[in-house]
Curated annotation (Swiss-Prot):
<dbReference type="InterPro" id="IPR008909">
    <property type="entry name" value="DALR_anticod-bd"/>
</dbReference>
<keyword id="KW-0436">Ligase</keyword>
<keyword id="KW-0547">Nucleotide-binding</keyword>
<dbReference type="InterPro" id="IPR015944">
    <property type="entry name" value="Gly-tRNA-synth_bsu"/>
</dbReference>
<keyword id="KW-0648">Protein biosynthesis</keyword>
<dbReference type="InterPro" id="IPR006194">
    <property type="entry name" value="Gly-tRNA-synth_heterodimer"/>
</dbReference>
<dbReference type="GO" id="GO:0004814">
    <property type="term" value="F:arginine-tRNA ligase activity"/>
</dbReference>
<dbReference type="GO" id="GO:0005524">
    <property type="term" value="F:ATP binding"/>
</dbReference>
<keyword id="KW-0030">Aminoacyl-tRNA synthetase</keyword>
<comment type="similarity">
    <text>Belongs to the class-II aminoacyl-tRNA synthetase family.</text>
</comment>
<dbReference type="Pfam" id="PF02092">
    <property type="entry name" value="tRNA_synt_2f"/>
</dbReference>
<dbReference type="GO" id="GO:0006420">
    <property type="term" value="P:arginyl-tRNA aminoacylation"/>
</dbReference>
<protein>
    <recommendedName>
        <fullName>Glycine--tRNA ligase beta subunit</fullName>
        <ecNumber>6.1.1.14</ecNumber>
    </recommendedName>
</protein>
<dbReference type="GO" id="GO:0004820">
    <property type="term" value="F:glycine-tRNA ligase activity"/>
</dbReference>
<keyword id="KW-0067">ATP-binding</keyword>
<dbReference type="GO" id="GO:0005829">
    <property type="term" value="C:cytosol"/>
</dbReference>
<keyword id="KW-0963">Cytoplasm</keyword>
Length: 688
């Protein structure tokens, strides 16, 4: 009989960042194992808190589904003679499958009939299977930094302290890492009554909530957000949406209670990042703002427990935050004693990477790349000067106490200190914008100088790493090279900006001045492949089909924005009534054109009018296509190319390309090569 199943793995405190992927994997592998064991169910979900990972399955079958297997044997004519008497082939096959020969059945496979052995395996009880499945599931979970404890060789995210496993009202027993499963769980570490008996799986959620544990992360997030907003509203304030902080806070606790604390209003004189960073990043508090978005001298924290004694908890948190803000204020005022531009020489003492020199040398490379990009992207004289100045100052804030204590403020504090040193607002903004887009963020540089610096910094990092033979492998990417490549793609796609990355990376390589160990050509090829992989995923994530993406990228992707515009034009072109015929015609031409020795066409060698017709059509269309490509009007270029379909079809209908006469054959191949290459300036339609 179907009944709910609860499997709970009780652990020491799991870091908040590990919880979401652990629950996703628990659900995924739970589904896979239940399918493997043929156990039917209505619904499955994973829940968790810092102290437990829970798989809950609704209406799990009481028995395994029976398995019917049909094993193909010899052809019927070989298994039985004309009188229907089994031959040695039939007898041997039946014996090998453990069935009686009279139980063999026949099945038609096309025009031939074969004999089959039908074997039925009775389903085992779910309790028996779950005792096997439980240890397999727990052992299959993978974590970034698993631990061992005691004398166990078993590894898990944190030490396992208990295992609850109940199917309906039946206890499922097994052992993992020396811990025996049973019908017991534990509530809140400080507020519950101790060990709790789960008599049936359906009691699980209610029992834990009565003991101050909200197992469902989504419900905890809702509770946290409602309480945080209410606490801020009590001080006539609001809290900005912050899904990342909300998720982290919800995964740090089991039973939320929010409170609103305050800090001295004098701290509001400091730049906002100096206040928000200690609150958000270090204390996991929600800053409170007024109706205009300005910070108020309040914060909202969330306590893991009930609302009892909240005044005492609030007071303790206020003391902690005041100490944090006092430190931040001291660092900020200390930093102002040395103007940002005066810190540059000290970068000679800061190592960028051991094999890639100092931060001072990196700044020199960024300055050179800023000059190159200013020309490549068409910056005016004012913007060029701003980009140059921003590059010179770009890393000076790394020497400040604020950035040393709060590394996440790099660039942000550079902007603040640049403004206080009298730098132009665009220069100060560019120093901040060099790190945009931030991981998971959508903000892009608003200044041209910021775009230049953001591109230059990432290119220097990528070329330096690849130039020293360092590339991401599998899940390992210690220098976040994939993220930096995606950052370049987003910058060029969404700003938007046209830039030849091959040329850009050659400039970045040259800026290292012979320091790199991998040859320039090899680095260029590796980076081209690396970016191609990123763009395949990115373009498909933005709604383009696999075929469209492959067709566009096959025509080149050194210019990311240009590749995107070609791809979107091809996607639109797919709706052309004759697209399939055009694609087929191009593919035929392209396949034969691979045999062409060149592209020189001699009209005097034409033997048939269809050759003249195709050549004249090509000349006329080429002029239109090249004019449209020069303006990046790829939709219009494809529309012009569509006019070649009929002449190409007539060409193939009228002549044989691979004739014995070499000169005629090569002339026809060259003509097809011209046609194919014209298409491939936009996309390779043979990829469809």
């Amino acid at each position: 009989m179907a009944a709910d199943l609860v499997l709970e793995i009780g652990t020491e405190e799991i870091p908040a960042r590990f919880l979401p992927p652990a629950l996703a994997e628990l659900a995924e592998k739970g589904r896979a194992l239940l399918a493997e064991y043929r156990l039917a169910y209505a619904d499955l979900a994973a829940y968790g808190t810092p102290r437990r990972l829970t798989l809950y399955v609704r209406d799990l079958a009481g028995d395994q589904a029976p398995l019917v297997q049909e094993i193909k044997g010899p052809p019927k004519k070989a298994a039985f003679d004309i009188d229907g008497v089994p031959t040695k082939a039939a007898l041997g096959f039946a014996r090998s499958q453990g069935v009686a020969v009279e139980d063999l059945v026949t099945r038609a496979v096309g025009p031939v009939e074969y004999v089959y052995a039908v074997r039925q395996e009775t389903g085992r009880p779910a309790a028996e299977i779950l005792a096997e499945l439980g240890p397999r599931l727990i052992g299959a979970l993978v974590f970034p930094r698993p631990m061992r404890w005691g004398d166990q060789d078993f590894r898990f995210v944190r030490p396992i302290r208990w295992i609850l496993c109940v199917h309906g009202d039946r206890v499922i027993e097994f052992t993992v890492a020396g811990v025996r499963s049973g019908p017991h769980t534990w509530g809140h570490r400080f507020l519950s009554a101790g060990r709790l008996l789960v008599t049936t799986a359906g009691d699980y959620f209610t029992l834990l909530e009565e003991n101050f544990v909200i197992v469902d992360p989504a419900r905890r997030r809702e509770m946290v957000w409602e309480q945080v907003r209410a606490a801020a509203a009590a001080e006539s304030g609001t809290v900005a949406d912050d899904p990342e902080l909300l998720a982290e806070v919800a995964d740090l606790l089991e039973y939320p209670s929010a409170f609103c604390g305050c800090f001295p209003e004098s701290y509001l004189e400091l730049p906002e990042p100096v206040l928000v960073t200690p609150m958000r990043e270090h204390q996991r508090y929600f800053p409170v703002r007024d109706g205009t978005g300005r910070l108020m001298p309040f914060f909202v924290g969330v306590h893991n427990g009930t609302a009892e004694h909240l005044n005492l908890i609030r007071s303790g948190n206020e003391k902690v935050l005041r100490a944090r803000l006092a430190d931040a204020a001291f660092f900020f005022r200390e930093d102002l004693e040395v103007p940002l531009p005066d810190r540059g020489p000290e970068l000679k003492k800061v190592v960028f990477q051991e094999s890639l020199g100092t931060m001072h040398e990196k700044v020199e490379r960024l300055t050179a790349l800023a000059g190159y990009l200013s020309s490549a992207l068409g910056l005016d004289e004012t913007e060029r000067a701003q980009a140059h100045r921003a590059a010179v100052l770009s890393k000076n804030d790394l020497l400040t106490s604020m950035v040393y204590e709060f590394p996440e403020l790099q660039g942000i504090m550079g902007r603040e200190y640049a403004l206080r040193a009298g730098e132009a607002p665009a220069v100060a903004e560019a120093i901040r914008e060099q790190y945009l887009p931030a991981p998971g963020g959508e903000e892009l540089p608003a200044t041209r100088a910021g775009l230049v610096l953001a591109l230059a910094d990432r290119a220097d990092n990528l070329v330096g790493a690849f130039g020293m033979g360092v590339q991401p492998t599998g899940s390992q990417d210690p220098y976040a090279l994939r993220r930096q490549a995606l950052g370049i793609c987003h910058l060029l796609l969404d700003t938007p900006a046209y830039l030849d990355l091959d040329d850009f990376f050659r400039e970045a390589y040259a800026a290292y001045g012979g320091r790199l160990t991998v040859e320039a050509g090899e680095v260029a090829a590796q980076l081209a492949d690396f970016f191609g992989q990123r763009l395949r995923v990115l373009f498909q994530d933005r709604g383009l089909s696999y075929g469209v993406v492959e067709a566009a990228l096959a025509a080149g992707h050194a210019d990311v924005r240009d590749a995107w515009e070609r791809a979107t034009a091809v996607a639109t072109f797919q709706s052309h009534p004759a697209f399939a015929d055009i694609s087929t015609a191009f593919t035929r031409a392209n396949n034969l054109a691979k045999n062409a020795a060149g592209t020189r066409v001699e009209p005097a060698l034409f033997k048939d009018p269809v050759e003249h017709t195709l050549y004249q059509a090509f000349l006329q269309v080429r002029e239109q296509v090249e004019a449209q490509i020069a303006r990046r009007r790829y939709g219009a270029a494809l529309a012009a190319l569509a006019e070649l379909r009929e002449p190409v079809d007539r060409f193939f209908d009228g002549v044989m390309v691979m004739v014995e006469e070499a000169a005629v054959r090569e002339n026809r191949l060259a003509l097809l090569r011209l046609v194919a290459d014209l298409f491939k300036g936009i996309a390779d339609l043979s990829k469809f």
